[in-house]
C-alpha cells in the first residue's frame, strides 16, 4: 500500500511498502539539495509522496532501477548481503538526499528505511526525458552522478584506514552533512555504523570510548555525538 499526497505522476506500487504517518524529523537537521535547484523542483512537481515504515525494504538488489527517490524525512541505508552472510552498508541518505541513481538498469544495492520515512519518488524515464529538454535538470543529474562517484571513491579510501581513522572520518562526514555545528543526533545504530565502516560493533564502541577519553568527542547517549575537538578528528582523518 502507498500514500500519494501530491504530484502528477502515478505513484509506483511496491510489495514491501507500508502507508502510515511519519513522525517528526530527528533533532538534527541535515543539509540536502537546495529547494530551488532544477532537479529538486522537478521531483517535487512530477513525483509522488510515499511513506515506508522503519526497516521496510524500499527496493531490492537487482530489482529494476525504474525510480529515483528524494528523502523528505527520516533516513535510508543502502546495503548488500555478502556471500558469507555479512551485511555491507553502501551509504546513508538523509533529508534532502537523492538515492536510487544507477549506472545500469538494475539496483546494485538494496535500500531500506532506517526510521519511518517519507520520500518523493519520480520515474527515472520521466526525469531522463526532462533532462533531454532542460539544461538545468541535466546539469543537476550530472552533478548528482559525480557526487555518487566521489562518495564511492571516498569509501574505497576509507576502508584501508585504521578503526580510529574510519570512525573519525564518519563523524566528520555526518557533521558536514548536518546543519548543526557540533552536536549530531545519529539516526543509525552502532551496528549500522559498523557495517558501513567494515568494523565490528565492539570495535566501533571501543573507538568511540577512546575518542571520548581523549576529549575529542562527548557521547551523552548512544545516538548523540558532540564533537569537542574537530582538529583532533581531522588529524585522524588525514
Regions from the PLM with identified roles:
Residues 56-115:
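Cyclic nucleotide-binding regulatory domains
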Residues 41-42, 58-62, 178:
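Short loop/turn motifs at secondary-structure junctions and domain boundaries
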Residues 91-150:
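Cyclic-nucleotide recognition modules
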Residues 132-201:
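Polybasic "coupling" helices that flank or enter modular domains
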Residues 68, 92, 121, 187, ...:
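Short aromatic/basic micro-patch
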Amino acid at each position: 500500500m502507498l500514500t500519494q499526497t501530491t504530484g502528477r505522476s502515478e505513484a509506483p506500487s511496491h510489495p514491501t511498502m507500508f502507508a502510515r504517518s511519519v513522525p517528526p524529523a530527528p533533532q538534527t537537521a541535515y543539509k540536502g539539495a537546495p529547494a530551488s535547484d532544477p532537479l529538486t523542483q522537478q521531483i517535487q512537481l512530477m513525483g509522488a509522496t510515499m511513506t515506508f515504515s522503519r526497516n521496510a525494504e524500499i527496493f531490492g538488489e537487482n530489482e529494476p532501477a525504474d525510480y529515483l527517490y528524494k528523502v523528505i524525512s527520516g533516513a535510508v541505508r543502502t546495503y548488500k548481503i555478502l556471500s558469507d552472510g555479512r551485511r555491507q552498508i553502501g551509504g546513508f541518505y538523509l533529508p534532502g538526499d537523492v538515492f536510487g541513481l544507477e549506472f545500469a538498469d538494475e539496483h546494485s544495492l538494496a535500500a531500506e528505511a532506517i526510521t519511518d520515512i517519507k520520500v518523493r519518488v519520480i520515474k527515472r524515464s520521466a526525469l531522463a526525458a526532462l533532462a533531454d529538454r532542460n539544461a538545468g535538470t541535466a546539469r543537476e543529474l550530472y552533478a548528482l552522478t559525480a557526487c555518487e562517484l566521489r562518495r564511492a571513491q571516498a569509501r574505497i579510501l576509507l576502508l584501508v584506514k585504521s578503526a580510529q581513522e574510519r570512525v573519525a572520518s564518519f563523524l566528520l562526514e555526518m557533521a558536514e552533512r548536518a546543519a548543526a555545528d557540533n552536536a549530531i543526533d545519529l539516526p543509525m545504530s552502532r551496528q549500522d555504523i559498523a557495517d558501513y565502516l567494515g568494523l565490528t560493533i565492539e570495535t566501533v564502541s571501543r573507538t568511540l570510548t577512546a575518542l571520548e577519553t581523549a576529549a575529542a568527542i562527548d557521547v551523552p547517549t548512544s545516538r548523540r555525538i558532540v564533537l569537542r575537538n574537530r582538529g583532533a578528528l581531522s588529524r585522524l582523518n588525514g
